[in-house]
């Protein structure tokens, strides 16, 4: 029973931590914290599986864990979407910057070319 309480505490902390997504330089530390919390949670879950943990719908703690797990999955998806959006914006910025420095790199015009035909 001790591990289920520990899992509940770690899951609640993770759910709370996933509540707001920081911007900029703070995001790297934020993601590292998420990874460490997920690793802790994973080790606790593996320990529970080795003990032969059985889910009981009548148990209040088990239902709370299930609800927290659903919320964690939703918030993790939101974090992933935010990171994907930032990566897409970064790629767009890089492309715009490259286009600014060399505006004629993608132009494929054959103007000014001629073929010298010698018999």
From Swiss-Prot:
It comes from the Bacteria. Disulfide bonds: none annotated. Keywords: Bacterial flagellum biogenesis, Chaperone, Coiled coil, Cytoplasm. Its main location: cytoplasm. GO terms for cellular component: cytosol. Transmembrane segments: none annotated. One of its GO terms (biological process) is bacterial-type flagellum organization. Residues 72-99 form a coiled coil. Signal peptide: none annotated. It is found in: Cytoplasm, Cytosol. Belongs to the bacillales FliT family. May act as an export chaperone for the filament capping protein FliD. Homodimer. This is Flagellar protein FliT. It comes from Lysinibacillus sphaericus (strain C3-41).
């Amino acid at each position: 029973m001790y591990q289920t309480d520990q899992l509940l505490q770690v899951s609640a902390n993770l759910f709370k931590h996933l509540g707001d997504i920081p911007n900029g330089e703070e995001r790297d530390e934020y993601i590292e914290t998420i990874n460490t919390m997920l690793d802790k949670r994973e080790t606790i879950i593996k320990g529970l599986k080795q003990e032969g943990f059985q889910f009981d719908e009548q148990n209040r703690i088990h239902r709370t864990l299930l609800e927290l797990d659903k919320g964690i999955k939703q918030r993790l998806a939101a974090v992933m979407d935010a990171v994907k959006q930032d990566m897409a914006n970064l790629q767009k910025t890089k492309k715009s910057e490259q286009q600014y420095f060399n505006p004629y790199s993608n132009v494929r015009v054959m103007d000014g070319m001629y073929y010298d035909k010698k018999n």
